[in-house]
Amino acid sequence: MVYSYSEKKRIRKDFGKRPQVLDIPYLLSIQLDSFKKFTDQDPTGERGFEAAFRSVFPIKSFSGNSELQYVSYKLGEPVFDVKECQIRGVTYSAPLRVKLRMVLYDREAAPGTVKDIKEQEVYMGDIPLMTENGTFVINGTERVIVSQLHRSPGVFFDHDRGKTHSSGKVLYNARIIPYRGSWLDFEFDPKDALFVRIDRRRKLAASIILRALDYSTQDILDLFFDRVNFKIKKDSLVMDLVAERLRGETASYDIKDVEGTIIVEKGRRITARHIRQLEKSNTTELEVPVDYIVGKISGQDYIDPDTGEVLVSANAEMTLEDLAKLSLAGIKEISTLYINELDNGAYMSDTLRIDSTTNRLEALVEIYRMMRPGEPPTKDAAEALFQNLFFSEERYDLSKVGRMKFNRRLGIDDDEGTGILSKEDIVAVMKNIITIRNGNDEVDDIDHLGNRRIRSVGEMAENQFRVGLVRVERAVRERLSLGDLNELMPQDLINAKPISAAVKEFFGSSQLSQFMDQNNPLSEVTHKRRISALGPGGLTRERAGFEVRDVHPTHYGRLCPIETPEGPNIGLINSLASFARTNSYGFLETPYRKVIDGVVTDQVDYLSAIEEGRYVIAQAIVDLDENGRMMDELIACRHKGDSTFMGAADIQYMDVSPQQIISVAASLIPFLEHDDANRALMGANMQRQAVPTLKADKPLVGTGIERTLAVDSGVVVVAKRGGYIDYVDASRIVVKVNESELRPGEAGIDIYNLTKYTRSNQNTCINQRPCCAMGDPVVTGDVLADGPSTDLGDLALGQNMRIAFMPWNGYNFEDSILISERVAQEDRFTTIHIQELSCIARDTKLGSEEITADIPNVGESALSKLDESGIVYIGAEVKGGDILVGKVTPKGETQLTPEEKLLRAIFGEKASDVKDSSLRVPNSVKGTIIDVQVFTRDGVEKDKRAVEIEEMHVRQAKKDLTEEFQILEEGVYGRARNLLLSAGFNEAQLDAIPRSQLLSQSIDDEGKQTELEQLAEQHDELKADFDKKFEVKRRKITQGDDLAPGVLKIVKVYLAVKRTIQPGDKMAGRHGNKGVISKINPVEDMPYDENGNPIDIVLNPLGVPSRMNIGQVLEVHLGAAAKGIGDKIAAMLEEQRELAELRGYIKEVYELGEEVQQRVDIDSFTDDEVVRLAKNLKGGIPTATPAFDGAKEKEIKEMLALAGLPTTGQRKLFDGRTGDEFERQVTVGYMYMLKLNHLVDDKMHARSTGSYSLVTQQPLGGKAQFGGQRFGEMEVWALEAYGAAYTLQEMLTVKSDDVNGRTNMYKNIVDGNHQMQPGMPESFNVLLKEIRSLGINIELDQD
């Protein structure tokens, strides 16, 4: 593999045995592609804005004299960029402008004659835009729209598993689900009649819907039944024989062939052998006794030719009298329905008997009564209702997906078709459910991923937008029908508010629009790749059963079987697998390599769950020879959801990668294959809660996906084009672009501005640091700057800690963790948290609130950190209770008259009229002020601090833009200088020419002169662009802010809190091995090895066997080897060994392992590159052990040997307190530990007295309410069991809800008297009141 200059700084040793056929696709594409489809112009009109507009427009007036047509749309540019929106607390959005055409028709002239056309561009609200990282900024906060997994539109056949009826009989049903519109259900009842429901209302006989579709009884029987024909003879009947139909029946007469030979005797069962004999003898007719027809069902109406009387009606059971009547009337042939108990039931015939309607109108009225009970039905209303239910494009849409699924399920070859139902569709569904009831077809599996599809951001936003348009449509239609249209323009017809409201509601408060989890880069990526079955149109937590939540065979390679939350949402919220993507229909697809005749090709096909069922698919770990031929005779593979073994020739596809089945979070766990699934689930989930540490530390034992994840998450700065680093400082990186990658007429400079100390959604710190130096060469895709939790472009969520598995004086009982003081001293787990505190000055009824340093009844010392405007200084160190922003609120009983207001304004406020409502630091917080922002309403005078901040921002903006301009200008001048040198000028001449005149020189060569003129033009453009950018920036900074009604001023103070690790903090490894720190032990007391190196963390060995997460033990061994090799390299550097020896050792390390795919050609590295690599490997060589394809035990032992460590992975340890050796050897090594965002500082609080609940008068609960510890009923039992009566009495009275008792107690304590007199608990009074409310009078007798 070829490594770039920056990748050579540190190379991860990869133990993967399989070649990388396909790179992991861009991880955020599910979000970005979906939204791009929504906002991009689509000439076909099948998706996005175009589809929404075309589905609603043109809007015609009721009279048809005018219509409003849609022409085109365009999205404008956003006013503020993403960062400005976050600071100002506004939505990052762009205005949508739509060109509409109003056409007026001439009433007097011929129909369709146009009288007038007006075209205008109309504003239709702001549409939130997606940032380049797949998020939305709504009201200043970053949000993610989670994709939804919902039931695909189409037709589904199912049964109730025998749960509905007491007999346990299985009842089948069919359901047609449209994308929008009414659901249509068909279901059998226990008596095998077929019923229909519309929108889950009461059921009707299924034949009613067929009658409403204008089918007669005769038509219905013709559709659903084959016929058996009889000829009437004198004493018998002759039946037309279809031999196959007799199978399984018991002969009620002797069955003879043409020659009269008896084939089946009376009373015998007819078998397949008998049928073959009948077919052989070419018997086409069979004479049967007259009574054979009794009970058969007539297939049509039989009418007396003379009188016109109906002798036998269709669907009537035949009797001997009926036969006699027909014989008398001269009817020679009878047709009956072919019904067979085994595989041709009389279901529709029975249904017709239940049906009380006889014609179409009656059926329509019946449907109208069911849909609109209580309304008198009329013919027109009934017809219109039925038409609108399933046959109107406005009200009903199966969608492209629905039609495809519908047609495929019913065996129709064409995937295309209309979005509405046809008569044939409904009949086909009824025929299919009858086929299933007859046992000739299977029901569907609704948890199959071929029946569930993904609805992503773009599609959901489009649906919401359409909802808004439909609301507008009603209003427009009314306005078109009213008023004088000659005066109106399209602008006057459209009200954009409903559209904005629908879109805003979706992005702001939909269940699927979620506050982004921004703990670390991984949590961001996983949140964007989350797939939820909840939400509008989805499941609900309470009603979702076990089957829906379970892992389904079709999840393979599409949804991760590991990563899902614990708790009520388990299985309902899933994560997209690493390689999965959605197809044009919204179904999940996963890639497979094509296999032809047992040879694996490099062709990769994406298959959906529907297609996958047709193929035989082998795993990625199949042994192949050098030509890609499968070596084993029998190969483990999957076919139709089952695992089986097949020969190489039968295999059609093979997995792309062993990590294909799991999500990115799960594939970050090394040795995942050795962990129990439950613990792996916890491990995947807990990595998302890791807090970015002060100094990121790459994992020594990784999986090789760390780099991909860090780059795709968007937290690191990635080079857009190649070149070299021209300038670098803490806040910006300048890259001079390669000549080959330049666009014509540009300066060839890329400037990357870094994000510094910004607050994330979870109050963690986002900070970018350059990881390149001036002069470094850069290629496209190189990481230029690290973000939070990244180290040289690798994801680094935690720290590599030296751990030992051993008990230590009970301090690691029950998963507790003992850590060394050195960990805290070295700031290994120190994190920075940034809190935003806001102070809002409002306009109240009593006057305006004011932000000032003049606060009543506050001493000088409390104001020491405020400036004269009453706002805290940047850099001030504050603690709980300190004032951050001084604010006074007017208080008073009466409202002020205008005269009083004027007098107050002239003579100043009286102190007594205002109360202190300053913003103070919350009690348990201590930190440093890192930023202050002041937002002032337009028209309100800015205070001194606001003006200072504004000037500072303007200065900063000017400085940034000037530097940017100078860099670009330098690039232009540099190129001009090179051009002039090539045209014959020499260095001395050029030095003599002033820089400003360089571009105006004249050259003889015409081509070069043109090039110079282009550079001069470019310079002028840059200058103009600089002036324009600065003006825009300055205007944005100085303009007033658009604040909420009644708000005059907002001051936001940003407080940085540094948190070191301490007892009570939660830590975890990557294998679900979590625990709480019990003690921070002095370094000298920690166990140490023979070399005197102390252990950092001691874990309990009992946490491993029962939990079966052995991966952590292997990680510790491999970590020890990686660190040991790093130590050896460090020693070589320190001893200044020969470079050849160093190169040889590093080469040996990278070449270790069997069949390892990675090839690192250390020989091709320059000496400098080898030294730089060695320096970066001093702390340990990073290794990659991919899931299901990782390092083997043998390789770990080889690594240990190479590091000069015992291959057992265990060593002698000595007690730090006594110096004694421990009884047996201990597993010691390096484990990657995470500090989780469950910090004791955020959880611990104490209360003596505080607020009480109004009704029960008991203390509130929780830190936010400053509540108490609940003493529940189980704790009461404990005190009862101990017989601690006085303690119990105290708990239930004065410490809880005895109002008088607790007040007296408080007074007594103040007086130094520790007596208590318990009274009546308030909750007893509440109980009395509740009993009285039931109408039972209860009195308390206090004698």
Curated annotation (Swiss-Prot):
Q: What's the catalysed reaction?
A: RNA(n) + a ribonucleoside 5'-triphosphate = RNA(n+1) + diphosphate
> What is one GO cellular-component annotation here?
DNA-directed RNA polymerase complex
InterPro entries xrefs: DNA-dir_RNA_pol_bsu_external_1, DNA-dir_RNA_pol_su2, DNA-dir_RNAP_su2_dom, DNA-dir_RNAP_su2_hyb_sf, RNA_pol_bsu_bac, RNA_pol_bsu_CS, RNA_pol_bsu_protrusion, RNA_pol_Rpb2_2
EC nos:
2.7.7.6
The protein's UniProt keywords, in alphabetical order, are: DNA-directed RNA polymerase, Nucleotidyltransferase, Transcription, Transferase
According to the UniProt entry, its GO molecular function terms are: DNA binding; DNA-directed RNA polymerase activity; ribonucleoside binding
* Gene Ontology BP term (one): DNA-templated transcription
Instruction: Describe the family membership recorded for this protein in Swiss-Prot or TrEMBL.
Output: Belongs to the RNA polymerase beta chain family.
What functional role does this protein have? Answer: DNA-dependent RNA polymerase catalyzes the transcription of DNA into RNA using the four ribonucleoside triphosphates as substrates.
**Can you state the subunit structure given in the record?**
The RNAP catalytic core consists of 2 alpha, 1 beta, 1 beta' and 1 omega subunit. When a sigma factor is associated with the core the holoenzyme is formed, which can initiate transcription.
- Name the record gives this protein: DNA-directed RNA polymerase subunit beta
Per the UniProt record, the source organism is: Shewanella woodyi (strain ATCC 51908 / MS32)
